[in-house]
From Swiss-Prot:
Plays a central role in 2-thiolation of mcm(5)S(2)U at tRNA wobble positions of tRNA(Lys), tRNA(Glu) and tRNA(Gln). May act by forming a heterodimer with NCS6/CTU1 that ligates sulfur from thiocarboxylated URM1 onto the uridine of tRNAs at wobble position. One of its GO terms (molecular function) is sulfurtransferase activity. Disulfide bonds: none annotated. Keywords: Cytoplasm, tRNA processing. It is found in: Cytoplasm. It comes from the Eukaryota. It comes from Oryza sativa subsp. indica. One of its GO terms (biological process) is protein urmylation. This is Cytoplasmic tRNA 2-thiolation protein 2. Belongs to the CTU2/NCS2 family.
Amino acid sequence: MAAAAASSCGGAGCGPHCSSSASAAAVEDAAAAAAEKVGRLSLSRECGKCGGGAAAVAVAGGLGLCGECFRANLLGKFKLAVTSNAMVRPTDSVLLAFSGGPASRVALQFIHEMRCKAIESWDVSNSQALPVFGVGVAFVDESVLCSKPRDEIEMAIEDIRSIVSSLSTGVKAMHIVRLEDVFSTESEDGERRLREAVDMIGDDTGREDFLRCLRMLSLQKIAMENGYAKIMLGSCASAIACHVLSATVKGQGYSLPADVQYVDTRWEIPVVLPLRDCLAQELTLLCELDSLKTQQHLDRPSNGINSLVASFIKRLREENPSREHTIVRTAQKLKPFSFNKFSADGYHDFLPSRLRPKFQKVDSDESTFSEILCLMCGSPFSESELQNLESTKHKAQKKIDLYTAHCCQSCYFQILPAGENLNEHFFSLLPKLWTGKMDTISDSHSLLRDQIEEYLLEENDDGN
């Protein structure tokens, strides 16, 4: 591990008079090579934190850090996000969503190290009162929509397995599930239904967003079936910055605050984002320095609005790497929803007393949570969307009317096909985890309407 070699220069404990010139030269060469490979060409001659003589890569803000301090800086951000936001309790079992890219690879490494440290602390503890949280890994296989040869796909998936299995301890289980599995029924394989549903979406951006929704649904399904308490995503500041701009362009400004917080409990299994303060370039550089193997062979090319926004963010990054942080910090100033923190009774009892006041329950009067979420993407409804839903409930004659009314405006215009007949067929293809909820609502609505009609007087009834 290249970063480990930097410990010879002292890392965080090294002074300005480090004498390991040979090791420093080796680290300098490694850092320069890694920086060039990921496009980080800005180097300084010494670490701005420990003052060591090794070459330092420039991070956001212009401060140069040696390999050891650079790694400690990212790990510190990760730990701070996890602990200060109460993301993981000792009794939790956490499911890490692993894509094979640098962000999820670093998240896997860091949560693994945190668990190993917790196990060491538990072993030396006299009381051993608190258990150690568990970690599982999930990979959603989307190769059914990939045009690559099957042998290449299988080799990439095997690489995913080897990356996870290379961790000596700490991983509870490895779950590799096919995206089409959420469409499967007892009588039908899900591949045909997935392909047909995707083909019915005419908008490139809509197709990408639809697949993203299916990915979350798959992770939720894995977590529920295997007893996980949290889902940990590798979404970093760069990815969130792209989402902020793309969501704004798509007209999703009302629901945007829900997507940029550390914690999101609107889902049945809460979702946490411990890498929210880390840039993609920093995570890629750490993978290079630490020789962390990644696998991005199965990545699908982006199109539409998402691709344009990613290109725009890349241009901004070239001018000033801190622009991504600026975008994320600006979005964080928006008022979060009540589901953007854990508030269950007793949830924070294990926390140190100095942190507990931060997690006081959100007052019901201050809550902005509408309690109505989009059928597909899970976005909270705005006031206009709520009004449309209420209006539809009163005059809906068909189940399809309720289905479409429970979709946010973005999903309605970008994902749903045009035409009532097409919509009916499209909804018939969707996973039962989505449509089952609407069927329950529709049945309740029909029952209520029938009960009301029983008490209504007919036009020719004289009241006797």
